[in-house]
């Protein structure tokens, strides 16, 4: 697998939301530590749902508690957002990020009010697990397993679950319930993406919004791509993030050597 493709698809500029969000998260972290403790108004509390505190319910992914917390979340979510944004559009991806935050917060608050009423959470790692679950569903339809070593493979669909528990072991202070809820939402989004589309604004609304803010979109620097609604087609089939000869694996063993297959021009997700 070509890891570079996760960050900078060949011959393509960086995606606008992925870059902008990374910069914004960093700026908020600096403001919180140097200017004003903004995290006090962003961290999600289990009682936030019952107080109808919309700031905390939707904005808690923006709050980070340490530099390493910020660094690992920016690095892990960047590639996921790049891939999703390229195939779904910048504005639509922003809507999805907000929906994921809200629909993760609701069950977290319900569970947390009973089991851990005094625990606050923040950070974008829930987004990472949601997108990880989403891409695992899509990838599992192309590759049923991922090669870990030359002799050991792991089911593609359950790889995020393994990573969920590894993360809990390596970072015991992280929110396992929040990550698990985010992962379940990602699985749901991958399995029922047409259902998710029904709770997002219609395409014509997104196009209208982009028309209104077009002067601002045109200010985006060269080398950073804003994927407009008119440029994307969310009905296109998923393309594996694995490149070259690994892009498809057989689902069963065969005793006869496979005949050479035509190697067409591959494309990165969303092209």
UniProtKB/Swiss-Prot annotation:
It catalyses: Cleaves type-1 transmembrane domains using a catalytic dyad composed of serine and histidine that are contributed by different transmembrane domains. The chain crosses the membrane at residues 16-36, 64-84, 89-111, 115-137, 152-172, 176-196. Its EC number is 3.4.21.105. Keywords: Golgi apparatus, Hydrolase, Membrane, Protease, Serine protease, Transmembrane, Transmembrane helix. The active site is at 125 (nucleophile), 179. The keyword Transmembrane helix applies. It comes from the Eukaryota. GO terms for cellular component: Golgi membrane. It is a multi-pass membrane protein. Pfam families: Rhomboid. Its main location: Golgi. It is found in: Golgi apparatus membrane; Golgi apparatus, cis-Golgi network membrane. One of its GO terms (molecular function) is serine-type endopeptidase activity. One of its GO terms (biological process) is proteolysis. The keyword DNA-binding does not apply. InterPro entries: Peptidase_S54_rhomboid_dom (IPR022764), Rhomboid-like_sf (IPR035952). Residues 252-271 are annotated as: Disordered. Probable rhomboid-type serine protease that catalyzes intramembrane proteolysis. Belongs to the peptidase S54 family. This is Rhomboid-type serine protease 2.
């Amino acid at each position: 697998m070509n890891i570079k493709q996760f960050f900078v698809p060949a011959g393509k500029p960086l995606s606008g939301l992925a870059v902008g969000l990374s910069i914004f998260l960093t700026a908020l972290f600096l403001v919180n530590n140097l200017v004003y403790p903004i995290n006090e108004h962003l961290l999600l509390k289990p009682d936030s749902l019952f107080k109808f505190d919309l700031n905390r319910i939707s904005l808690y992914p923006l709050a980070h508690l340490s530099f390493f917390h910020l660094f690992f979340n920016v690095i892990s979510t960047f590639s996921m957002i790049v891939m999703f944004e390229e195939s779904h559009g910048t504005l639509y991806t922003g809507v999805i990020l907000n929906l994921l935050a809200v629909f993760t917060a609701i069950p977290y608050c319900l569970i947390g009010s009973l089991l851990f009423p005094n625990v606050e959470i923040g950070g974008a790692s829930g987004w990472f697990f949601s997108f990880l679950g989403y891409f695992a569903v899509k990838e599992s339809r192309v590759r049923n397993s991922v090669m870990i070593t030359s002799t050991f493979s792991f089911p593609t669909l359950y790889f995020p679950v393994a990573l969920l528990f590894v993360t809990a072991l390596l970072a015991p202070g992280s929110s396992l319930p929040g990550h698990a809820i985010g992962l379940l939402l990602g699985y749901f989004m991958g399995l029922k993406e047409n259902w998710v589309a029904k709770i997002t604004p219609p395409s014509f609304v997104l196009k209208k919004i982009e028309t209104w803010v077009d002067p601002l979109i045109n200010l985006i620097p060269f080398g950073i791509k804003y994927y407009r609604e008119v440029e994307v087609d969310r009905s296109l089939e998923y393309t594996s993030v694995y490149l070259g000869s690994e892009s498809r694996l057989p689902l069963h063993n065969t005793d006869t050597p496979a005949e050479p297959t035509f190697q067409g021009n591959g494309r990165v997700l969303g092209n």
